[in-house]
Amino acid sequence: MQIILLEKVVNLGNLGDIVKVKDGYARNFLIPNKQARRATKEALAEFEVRRAELEKVAAEKLAAAQAQGEKLAGSTVQINQKAGVDGRLFGSVTNADIAEALVKQGFAVEKAQVRLPEGPLKLVGEHAVQISLHTDVLVDVTVAVIGEHV
């Protein structure tokens, strides 16, 4: 299916690009999330009329994400979790736990924005985690997992 991207999509293209994707990806994800639109003649004409407005909105989102990223960059989040004597956690620290701790500190972060490349944290100590505030804005945050010995 040919679609017009209404915003930048990772591994696909930028605002205004016309790309071919699988029908299910377009119908079930991109179009419902208002990230794309079918590439018909009418849609292309309407897009060209609204292009400046969409670019302005995209620039505002990027600026807001960069401002939040500057505040968030280099910060440390402490999470208490029950742990054994050897430093392994009972359970793990997930992206939802990290997002919740950041929200308590006053940052608007959703769990889908937290990137844990090695999976959930299972050891006591400091871990580097990335927060994806925008497709172009990645921020490094330190998560200090403090073990409560049982």
UniProtKB/Swiss-Prot annotation:
Entry keyword Ribosomal protein: yes
Q: Which residues form a coiled coil?
A: none
Keywords attached to this entry: Ribonucleoprotein, Ribosomal protein, RNA-binding, rRNA-binding
A GO BP annotation:
translation
Extract the GO molecular function terms from the UniProt entry: rRNA binding; structural constituent of ribosome
User: Which top-rank group of organisms is this from?
Assistant: Bacteria
InterPro entries in UniProt: Ribosomal_bL9, Ribosomal_bL9/RNase_H1_N, Ribosomal_bL9_bac/chp, Ribosomal_bL9_C, Ribosomal_bL9_C_sf, Ribosomal_bL9_N, Ribosomal_bL9_N_sf
Keyword Lipid metabolism on this protein?
A: no
Task: List cellular component terms (GO).
Answer: ribonucleoprotein complex; ribosome
Disulphides: none
- Pfam families, per this entry? Ribosomal_L9_C (PF03948), Ribosomal_L9_N (PF01281)
Q: Which family does it belong to?
A: Belongs to the bacterial ribosomal protein bL9 family.
Name the PANTHER family for this protein: 50S RIBOSOMAL PROTEIN L9
**Described purpose of this protein according to its UniProt entry:** Binds to the 23S rRNA.
UniProt name for this protein: Large ribosomal subunit protein bL9
Q: Which organism is it from?
A: Paraburkholderia xenovorans (strain LB400)
